[in-house]
A protein has these predicted regions:
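Extracytoplasmic/periplasmic substrate-binding proteins
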Residues: 29, 181, 218-303
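Hinge/lid segment of periplasmic solute-binding proteins
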Residues: 84-137, 147-158, 185, 268-272
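C-terminal lobe and pocket-closing loops
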Residues: 257-266, 275-370
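Glycine-centered hinge/linker elements that transmit conformational signals in sensory
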Residues: 158-159, 201-232
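Conserved C-terminal helix/tail region of periplasmic/extracytoplasmic solute-binding proteins
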Residues: 353-423
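A structural signal for short loop-to-beta-strand junctions that line the ligand-binding cleft
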Residues: 79, 107-143, 170-171, 278-284, ...
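A structural signal for multi-pass alpha-helical bundles of membrane permease subunits
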Residues: 445-732
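Extracytoplasmic/periplasmic solute-binding protein
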Residues: 125-131, 136, 156-205, 248
Length: 732
């Protein structure tokens, strides 16, 4: 009995102590070995102390930042989270994260690689604990490269000796059109973006158009176009393929690349060489993964700080380095016997010490699109580096311009109330006119069945549309909204930022969108109708098999189809150019001019869209009695006349809704534009929906401006559908 009481007391005490442990929620986006190491750290921490209990939540990387900015201000976010440092400026400005106290900063500095500390500094304050870092280094195949190049001249000499472009072999491979992978050359030529420490402009803006940047872009273009040692239009997948197949001896890439290298490939890594022309090292961007503590009232700051101290300790760093295969920020760990012989991690450490921390300024994110556009112009020879960078600078200044002036919402609220009263009056009038109340009392059953659909429409269509339209009257930056009235609409419709002939203007994009929709729908209907007429004929054998095969393009997810066609249009390795070359024709740079890029998009979307029209037309054709065509045949009508005067008029009632639906789909076909041409060249093949996306997510998160774009898209489609409907009724 005494033993039973003793164990009950122990149980109650342990329950009480566990209940007293406060929870620390940590968000992360780790996968694989990194996640396993973090889970082990959590387990160790929870076992070694009884004051806090850490809980980890894995959030997909693509959704991470948006979830944070939405959840933390509302008190629904984590106590701490692990993320790359480049968003620190945004989060510090919006009050999402808490700055570190001076004692913690001094302690971290003792045993951290200096550049990883610098990356976490914003406005002279430190905002996080450095955990690990990523930068690009030089990967090389040890079976092809016997000596590590110490300079770019040596690297080019090795690359030239191993290049055979006619057979698809290149001495060096990297994504030359990417700003991230081109940054080592920009810094190697002493270039800058003016967000770097010690190189900032007084006005805090970027400086893309400096001579050193131009020299770097010229050098990259020479590697790709003149020397031909780097593949054109290189993508991440292509770089991996070339390296694994032994068709590229050297690659500039980051630690994520190791997971893509085949197991039987002999390789090693080295620090990027010195630029022979300048004597400067190739300095890549440094990205630091930091442990950041959220800042709102309910955050368990003490618990979050306690876990931060543990995972940044020597023990925590060793687990992350050895088991998680992370390049950790803790200096002393590289002297440990477990890592002292690890060449790969030590090379990444050496590269980190000379790399340039990517700026965490909110305006840094604005430079990617203008700089990428300048790079692509130079690579395809459309403009000189100097002119391309001048255009990039102007584009940056437009994207980062101040928000419109705030306006009083009083007048707009009055207008909204008047409109609401008019709408309510119209609604009441319609209810009385159609005796809705009486009908509801007499026959409630039909309305009972209609209610779920009506409720879903209100919840999923009308409310989001109303919210989206309302956002169009606001301007957003760094988590803050301010009412600006019709300013966004005025800026778009008056083309205040860009000339009408500029690819980034609303009217140019509208013209491209209308042409894109018209050409696609014409091809969808023409090809679909032609195939339907063939499949209808009884003399065609295996019609069922053909129908099934022709529906496949429509059944495959469109993003998969888009990526396949994107690869087929590659200049050097694509199947389309392979066919052209087999016929003795020159290969085409499909995305270097408007018409070829537009044709590539249209081809891809036609492949996706014709099956829908074929199925619709085939169903309508099978409902047309053959006797009508036989009678026309007896009257002497030929095939074309029978189709024109008998078949097509009977098809129109079925085709018209399909054409309207297909037009709306094509008008908003974001995936094809985004994945195939990416809007190239210079945004010329963008359509309205892809432009709205860029304003929302790539140009300082201008949600109000993007919402105004979306509202205008809705108005255009509404006018189109109503016009088409009236024309169809008039003709019928």
């Amino acid at each position: 009995m005494k033993r039973l009481i003793f164990f009950l007391i122990l149980f109650l005490l342990s329950s009480l102590s566990s209940a007293e442990r406060s929870t620390v929620t940590v968000w992360h986006s780790y996968r694989g070995s990194e996640q396993i190491a973090l889970e082990k750290l959590k387990g160790n921490f929870n076992e070694q102390q009884d004051q806090y209990k850490v809980e980890l939540l894995n959030i997909p990387y693509d959704a991470f930042a948006n979830k944070l900015t939405n959840a933390i201000p509302r008190g629904n976010g984590p106590d701490a989270f692990i993320f790359a440092h480049e968003r620190i400026g945004d989060w510090a400005e919006s009050g999402i994260i808490k700055e570190l106290d001076s004692a913690s900063v001094e302690k971290i500095k003792i045993d951290s690689i200096p550049t990883t500390i610098d990356a976490l500094k914003y406005k002279d304050k430190f905002w996080g604990y450095p955990l690990s870092f990523k930068s690009v280094v030089l990967f090389y195949r040890t079976d092809l490269v016997k000596k590590v190049p110490a300079s770019t001249d040596e690297m080019l000499s090795i690359a030239e000796s191993l290049t055979d472009s006619e057979n698809g072999k290149y001495g060096l491979a990297f994504e030359a059109s990417s700003v991230y992978f081109s940054a080592p050359f920009i810094y190697g030529f002493d270039g800058k973006f003016c967000f770097e420490e010690g190189k900032k402009r007084k006005d805090g803006e970027a400086c893309l158009n400096n001579p050193q940047n131009a020299a770097a872009l010229k050098y990259i273009a020479e590697l790709v176009n003149e020397k031909g040692i780097v593949p054109q239009e290189a993508t991440s997948a292509l770089v991996t393929q070339l390296f694994n197949e032994g068709r590229s001896a050297m690659v500039i890439n980051g630690p994520w690349f190791m997971g893509e290298i085949a197991k039987d490939v002999p390789y090693d890594v080295a620090v990027l060489p010195v630029v022979s022309e300048t004597g400067e090292l190739l300095k890549p961007f440094l990205t630091v993964e930091a442990y950041l503590i959220a800042d709102y009232k309910t955050v368990n700051k003490k618990g979050a700080k306690a876990f931060a101290k543990y995972i940044t300790s020597f023990e925590g760093a060793k687990i992350r380095a050895v088991e998680g295969r992370q390049a950790v920020s803790t200096k002393s760990i590289y002297k440990d016997e477990a890592l002292i012989g690890d060449n790969i991690l030590n090379v990444f450490r050496q590269q980190a010490e000379i790399a340039v921390p990517m700026s965490n300024s909110p305006k840094m994110r604005v430079i990617w699109e203008p700089m990428a556009g300048a790079l692509r112009k130079v690579l395809r020879g459309a403009e000189s580096p100097e002119r391309a960078l001048e255009a990039a600078q102007k584009q940056y200044e437009i994207f980062s311009k101040p928000l419109p002036k705030a306006k009083s919402p009083v007048v707009y609220v009055v207008i909204l109330l008047i409109a609401g009263l008019i709408g309510l009056g119209y609604f009441v009038r319609q209810v009385r006119k159609h005796n809705f109340i009486k009908s509801l009392k007499e026959s409630p059953t039909p309305y009972f069945y209609l209610f779920p659909a009506m409720f879903s429409m209100v919840l999923l269509v009308f409310i989001p549309f109303a919210v989206g339209t309302a956002v169009a009257f606001f301007a957003h930056r760094s988590g803050e909204y301010q009412f600006v009235g019709f300013s966004n609409f005025i800026s778009i419709l008056l083309s205040e930022d860009f000339p009408i002939t500029n690819p980034l203007s609303f009217y140019f994009t509208l013209g491209v969108t209308v042409m894109w929709t018209s050409v696609n729908v014409f091809l969808h209907v023409s090809i679909g109708l032609m195939l339907a007429l063939m499949l209808r004929e009884p003399w065609l054998k295996m019609r069922g098999v053909y129908r099934m095969l022709l529906i496949i393009p429509w059944a495959v997810p469109n993003y998969i189809t888009a990526l396949i066609w994107k690869g087929m249009f590659n200049r050097q390795f694509g199947a389309i150019n392979g066919i052209l070359q087999s016929m003795g024709l020159e290969p085409v740079s499909w995305f270097s001019s408007f018409w070829t890029s537009f044709a590539a998009n249209v081809t891809t979307n036609t492949w996706l869209g014709f099956p829908f029209m074929m199925v619709t037309a085939l169903g309508a054709l099978q409902a047309i009695p053959r006797e009508l065509e036989d009678a026309a045949n007896v009257d002497g009508a030929n095939s074309f006349e029978r189709f024109r005067h008998v078949t097509f008029p009977l098809l129109k009632p079925a085709l018209l809704p399909a054409v309207i639906l297909g037009s709306v789909w094509t008008f908003n076909m974001f995936n094809i534009i985004y994945l195939v041409s990416g809007g190239e060249p210079d945004g010329g093949t963008e359509i309205l929906i892809s432009e709205a996306y860029k304003w929302a997510f790539q140009r300082q998160e201008r949600y109000g401006y993007a919402a105004a774009y979306a509202t205008l898209i809705f108005i255009v489609l509404l006018v189109y559908s109503k016009t088409t409907e009236k024309v169809g009724k008039g003709k019928s």
